[in-house]
């Protein structure tokens, strides 16, 4: 988790992006084969077409280097807020650890 947290700090030191760990790793229920679920929330107005490559893909790459599966999902703040009544949103909110 240290490498993931360090990458988040490096990538987003001057930006308006938040990265959260959720799922089994956040709950402390992970097994060796568990993936790392990351929610990336960017400010509204971010060029979402290029945002995945800029904000999410580096986590996928570091996962390959570490031999881990990292699964990032990306939303803008308003997109994430629109998910408020979904089971996914509620599960993430229950588990989320800000990196």
PLM feature segments, named:
Residues 24:
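Conserved H-loop
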Residues 37-41:
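Short, aliphatic-rich beta-strand segments
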Residues 1-18, 27-32, 42-99:
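Catalytic core of pol beta-like nucleotidyltransferases
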